[in-house]
Amino acid sequence: EEVVHTALNLLNRDVESVFSTRIIVTPESKKGMIIVGTIGQSDLIDKAGVDLSPIKNKKEAFLLAVSSTGKLVIAGSDKRGTAYGVMELSRLIGVSPWEWWADATPAKKEIFQLPASYRNVQSPSVEYRGIFINDEDWGLTPWSWQTYEPSDVKGQIGPKTHERIFELLLRLRANTFWPAMHGCSVPFYFTPGNKEVADKFGIFIGTSHCEPMMRNTNGEWKRDGVGEYDYVHNSAHVLSFWEQRVKEVAGLDNLYTLGMRGVHDGAMNGAKTIEEQKAVLTKVLKDQRDLLTKYVNKDVTQVPQVFIPYKEVLDVYHAGLQVPDEVTLMWCDDNYGYIRHFPTAEERARKGGNGVYYHISYWGRPHDYLWLGTAHPSLV
């Protein structure tokens, strides 16, 4: 898997940084002192003489252990688990996940040892873990297209920049990313190479509460949409807009946002009352899941999906909107660090589980908190 090879290349770079030498890669198990592989995909791992039961049938789990022959075994339950296990070795030799972004140059070493009894087993407690590049207007966007990855296309955040972001996420064992979506930034899928580099680093791409079905509505409707972004009076064109993107990305790792708001962080068009909005959202959810069934997986319950009741949508949810059981409910703060709705016992028992959409900083009218860290760490 590509993400495993990505992690191995990072490890090799890290080893060279710490020990001033490189790892020699060999397919011959007798010569290699480090064995890397994924359960069920590598005979070397399956026959390494290490108990793999603690990570079997788990998502993104890894195990580091010293075998009876003195070899270090790095095993993963799946491709991301294996990659995280490789990156754990980088941490053990002293390389910070922030080594590039924070200029955290690792200390030089001549030797590194693990005891014969060494065993390190880890797995995530949260299935989808990631960040949202937002309010990027005077930060990431100008730095990317003007400085780090110069481009003639104003506002373009390209694959070179995303590679640095995704490397950090991989090193931190994060697996999910919502791309920048303000009007100052070129939409993620408009730039060649962006979706490919996400796959290279094992990243699920998703979209925010006002960007359903992998569409940057704010940046893409004006180019690809027809008429008003209104599911009451223009549903055929809106559905076609979503369908184009689902067809394009169907084979990739995605976390599909369901539902609908306005073009950019406003209430939906065409429905004024709570009951009208509930009726529209009920149809939207059905039609969106029909697209996922048609293009992604005939068993739509196996497709990663999330519904985000942000701002006015929470009122619609409280009015009785029914969200399919396997769809994750992502609860939101009030923009200032206080969660508006904590899941009930019934919501906690849902197959899709629950998530959190949280503002570390907030930009919005009539005031914003971009320059001062006003969300106390105890809230986070």
Model features per residue range: what roles?
Residues S96-K154, K160-A180, G352-G355:
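An acidic-aromatic substrate-binding cleft motif
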Residues R129-I133, T176-P179, I205-S208, Y256-L258, ...:
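Hydrophobic faces of well-ordered beta-strands that scaffold small-molecule active sites
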Residues S68-T105, F188-R215, G219-K247:
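Hydrophobic or amphipathic alpha-helical targeting/insertion segments
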Residues E1-S123:
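Contiguous, structured surface segment used for ligand recognition
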Residues V73-G76, N134-P159, N175-S185, E220-V238, ...:
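The substrate-binding groove and active-site-proximal loops of carbohydrate-active enzymes
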Residues L170, N175-W178, S185-F188, G193, ...:
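Structured mid-domain segments that build the active-site/substrate or prosthetic-cofactor binding neighborhood
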Residues I23-V25, A107-L114, H182, Y189-F190, ...:
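Gly/Pro-rich turn-and-neighbor structural signature
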Residues V15, D78, I131, R173, ...:
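Conserved, mostly hydrophobic/aromatic
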